[in-house]
């Protein structure tokens, strides 16, 4: 891989051996990319709006991926997750046959690796969207040779609780089972999903195998769960890693460590090879 650093102006250039693209010197390519984005947006945004967006690194990098000028891109230390996601959605879009773009975070400690989804993309998914999110995460787990058994989470285990979220999650489990996804046959609280002894006591009819993919009922709960695992459980977090986008682009938290940046970049480069 040949890394390229996107910079707004020359004042941010660091002599670190990387190739640099200085946006303030790329007016011709910015105009060309903006014209392409107008075509992609198909009347939803005019040229002036696209040109303004293309002067930012998220949009310029996303368009480089779209036009195959680079294989992959990462960002997020300065720009927000929303900035990266908007650029990815508008410039690149979803893979063919993908209805829902989502994200995963790999939580890791010692030899343990778990996938949490969806921490950054779909705020309040429907049952169908939740199944799409699960399918995306399971596919990612398989690509990474990780445990891909999925567990749908809520505050109910095997019909023990009632309410909007348990009902939605039960519907998602039903749809996922009908679609043949590799998931445990019922909704669960986190303790039942994570601890086989608890699951055996609370839900003896469920699959008694360790789950590797934890599907939260909404973005809020997943995001909170990731932060609790990081800060109180001392888990490392790699991501968020976008799923379902028709190109290799990812975002890391503005609080990311050097190790986080290296991990997300490595996964993004690996993902880039799948689009060649």
Predicted feature descriptions by range:
Residues 1-4, 8-276:
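Anion-binding alpha/beta catalytic cores of soluble intermediary-metabolism enzymes, centered on
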């Amino acid at each position: 891989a040949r890394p390229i650093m996107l910079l707004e102006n020359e004042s941010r250039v660091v002599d670190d051996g990387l190739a640099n693209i200085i946006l303030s010197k790329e007016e011709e390519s910015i105009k060309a990319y903006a014209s392409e984005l107008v075509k992609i947006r198909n009347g939803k945004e005019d040229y002036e709006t696209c040109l303004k967006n293309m002067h930012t690194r998220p949009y310029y990098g996303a368009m480089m991926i779209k036009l195959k000028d680079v294989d992959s891109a990462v960002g997020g230390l300065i720009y927000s997750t929303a900035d990266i996601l908007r650029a990815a959605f508008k410039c690149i879009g979803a893979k063919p046959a993908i209805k829902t773009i989502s994200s995963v975070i790999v939580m890791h400690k010692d030899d343990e690796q778990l996938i949490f989804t969806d921490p950054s993309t779909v705020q309040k998914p429907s049952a169908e969207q939740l199944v799409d999110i699960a399918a995306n995460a399971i596919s990612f787990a398989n690509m990474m040779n990780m445990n891909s058994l999925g567990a749908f989470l809520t505050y109910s285990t095997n019909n023990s609780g009632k309410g909007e979220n348990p009902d939605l999650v039960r519907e998602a489990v039903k749809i996922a089972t009908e679609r043949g996804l590799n998931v445990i046959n019922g909704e669960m609280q986190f303790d039942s999903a994570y601890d086989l002894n608890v699951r055996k006591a609370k839900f003896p009819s469920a699959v008694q195998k360790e789950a590797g993919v934890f599907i939260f009922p909404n973005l809020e709960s997943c995001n909170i769960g990731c932060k609790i695992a990081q800060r109180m459980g001392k888990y490392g977090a790699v991501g968020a890693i976008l799923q379902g986008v028709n190109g290799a682009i990812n975002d890391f938290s503005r609080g990311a460590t050097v190790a986080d940046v290296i991990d997300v970049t490595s996964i993004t480069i690996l993902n880039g090879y799948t689009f060649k």
